[in-house]
């Protein structure tokens, strides 16, 4: 099953029922336009064989986030969060230089971030989500604390130089994730996000193999 931040398209005949009150007409119009939903964190209310999804509407439609559950069997197609090069050409002109710099710097340290959130949905729908003050949401898949440190250093320097802001997560070897900015802090415990919830864990538990060595 696709993990959090993956984009999914439902079959044209798949039933969909908004869990967000009053949002059913907008949800139907969204899927009728051929747009995807994003896989969200499970909350325990899903039935067997279901996945929790979200549809974040653009600012022109109130930025409402519509929640729904769908049968896994009704998913026609799914893709991971988009690679950064896939979204750069769809970003506003004032973002282009900063994103190209981010891509070059990530390549230089051997990392390839993926993008979710407003930049991803602007890329896949063509609708205007991003503005000058937006954050770019990045997902970094990594295996070691050394990689995590390199990503944090890169992002801190990139924000300082470009005056842009990056949000997002470090995807840990076990498939869980932690906010990069929280990881960059000095707290002994960090909030770890899982597909089925969140919990506080000691920083030393994030890379257990290294700790055991």
Curated annotation (Swiss-Prot):
InterPro entries: Holo-ACP_synthase, MdcG_C, MdcG_N
Active-site feature positions: 135, 137
Enzymatic reactions: apo-[malonate decarboxylase ACP] + 2'-(5''-triphospho-alpha-D-ribosyl)-3'-dephospho-CoA = holo-[malonate decarboxylase ACP] + diphosphate
Record keyword Transferase present: yes
Pfam short name (any one): MdcG_N
Keywords on record: Nucleotidyltransferase, Transferase
GO molecular function, one term: nucleotidyltransferase activity
Enzyme Commission code(s) on record: 2.7.7.66
Enzyme class: transferase
Record-stated family: Belongs to the MdcG family.
Function recorded in the entry: Transfers 2'-(5-triphosphoribosyl)-3'-dephosphocoenzyme-A to the apo-[acyl-carrier-protein] of the malonate decarboxylase to yield holo-[acyl-carrier-protein].
NCBIfam families, alphabetized: malonate_mdcG
Record protein name field: Phosphoribosyl-dephospho-CoA transferase
Protein species of origin: Xanthomonas campestris pv. campestris (strain ATCC 33913 / DSM 3586 / NCPPB 528 / LMG 568 / P 25)
Gene name, Swiss-Prot/TrEMBL: mdcG
